[in-house]
Amino acid sequence: MASCNPTRKKSSASSLSMWRTILMALTTLPLSVLSQELVPANSTTSSTAPSITSLSAVESFTSSTDATSSASLSTPSIASVSFTSFPQSSSLLTLSSTLSSELSSSSMQVSSSSTSSSSSEVTSSSSSSSISPSSSSSTIISSSSSLPTFTVASTSSTVASSTLSTSSSLVISTSSSTFTFSSESSSSLISSSISTSVSTSSVYVPSSSTSSPPSSSSELTSSSYSSSSSSSTLFSYSSSFSSSSSSSSSSSSSSSSSSSSSSSYFTLSTSSSSSIYSSSSYPSFSSSSSSNPTSSITSTSASSSITPASEYSNLAKTITSIIEGQTILSNYYTTITYSPTASASSGKNSHHSGLSKKNRNIIIGCVVGIGAPLILILLILIYMFCVQPKKTDFIDSDGKIVTAYRSNIFTKIWYFLLGKKIGETERFSSDSPIGSNNIQNFGDIDPEDILNNDNPYTPKHTNVEGYDDDDDDDANDENLSSNFHNRGIDDQYSPTKSASYSMSNSNSQDYNDADEVMHDENIHRVYDDSEASIDENYYTKPNNGLNITNY
């Protein structure tokens, strides 16, 4: 029995040590695993606490980095924090690891209270930090972390001197920097200490035009943190700063601070061996320049929230918005701004119809230069072949040349429409080139025109002696025989107008009585008393009343 008791004691001791080992194993688990079981993935915890930063100046310039850490847990907790902008921000910020502040001697303490029941020490060594420009005045802060839910109690830091010039680099030298994170819970305490000394770095800030009093303050309204199940989490926040005067709470070894733009912005990114902290801040601040050696900066973040990184796969959406005529496509990772393709302006484009001025001038030139000469040539041809009458020359009885004009085609058409018949070969107009209605037929000769003309060779009834229609033929024969005397052919006769047959007393009896042309009893001698001689032997037949002239 005595031997069994030690065995039982050993077994109980071994079981007790086993339970202790299990308990230690449970306590050594990462806080993210415990928080995953304790807190839902979509839950967020909000807390509001002031964050005070005080900076003190020390004139030491070292370029070495010293990081000391101690951990009471066998399994380290690795936290990876990166930043991205939400659709409310105007652009995505890509952070690089460059430091743009020069601190002489600063110490920073952060204390936070936690609701988890575990105790661990997390040590992280800072390797590099950077400040890069960004753009916004005030945005919502959201971040995700693998650390348990905690609330920042206070932050203190001391700045030796800061110099910020227009369009120049801000250089701050840091000798040593201590970051202490303390988290309180019901049954455990998490603390970590980091001692770093950073060499001189530079940052370029946009040009400034205003300056403010040597002290400035800003507020942190609230912060929310929620745990994430993954070791690499996404942490994003932004804060809004407004410069104002406040009481000095830190001593500065430098006599002046620099001025910066009234609207400038920067992004601070800090990376360490065991954790990566990346923050995006969009402040609108103005620093001051003064000879007062004391200055204080009290900053309070506007609001911050932590969203688990596991939900970002579901939140990768594209948001389209139209702001002042511009279409903006944005998601959680990038922001693209496009100019509008169509404007909604009320003004309408004026359209003119018809030919342009150049084409109109070309057409006018072609019409005037080509069409007008063609029209003139056509009119001339119409006049020459259609309007102008044909000219015909005649020789009259006196041997003079008389010009007559044949009727034109328009006259013929007009007469044809009127129903008047005109012989083309026999109808001529007067001596007028245009022609007139004095159209005569040379084939039809009126006897009265022959008797009443001025031709001296033409006999007239008044000049015929002894001619009387009432007298009988015997009386006429006696008068003719008594008054007739042969004078022969007068010298006035022309060869063409000489009588083919003449009559005298000697040869008048040679004609046959049966001659059908002329009979002795019917032939009357024409004698003109007004002239000294007989102009012509002119014989007529009183039966038919026709005058026969020997032409």
From Swiss-Prot:
Residues bearing PTM Phosphoserine: 481-482
Compositionally biased tracts (Polar residues): 430-441
Annotated TM spans: 362-382
InterPro entries to which the protein is assigned, alphabetical: Immunoregulatory_rcpt-like (IPR051694), Mid2_dom (IPR007567)
Domain of life: Eukaryota
Extracellular side: 36-361
Region called Disordered, residue ranges: 108-143, 206-227, 243-263, 429-513
Reported effect, residue 427 to K: In strain: SK1
Mode of membrane association: Single-pass type I membrane protein
Main location: membrane
Record's subcellular location: Membrane
Biased composition (Low complexity): 498-508
Topology Cytoplasmic: residue spans: 383-551
Pfam families xref list: Mid2
Keywords in alphabetical order: Membrane, Phosphoprotein, Signal, Stress response, Transmembrane, Transmembrane helix
Cellular component terms (Gene Ontology): plasma membrane; vacuole
Signal peptide range in chain numbering: 1-35
Bias type Acidic residues, positions: 466-477
GO BP terms: cellular response to glucose starvation; cellular response to oxidative stress; fungal-type cell wall organization; protein catabolic process in the vacuole
Similarity comment text for this entry: Belongs to the MID2 like cell wall stress sensor family.
Job of this protein: Involved in cell integrity signaling during vegetative growth at elevated temperature. Acts positively on the PKC1-MAPK pathway. Cell membrane sensor of oxidative stress in the cell integrity pathway upstream of PKC1. Required to transmit the oxidative signal to SLT2 and to restore the correct actin organization following oxidative stress. Multicopy suppressor of 1,3-beta-glucan synthase (GS) mutation. Also suppresses RGD1 null mutations.
Protein name: Protein MTL1
Organism: Saccharomyces cerevisiae (strain ATCC 204508 / S288c)
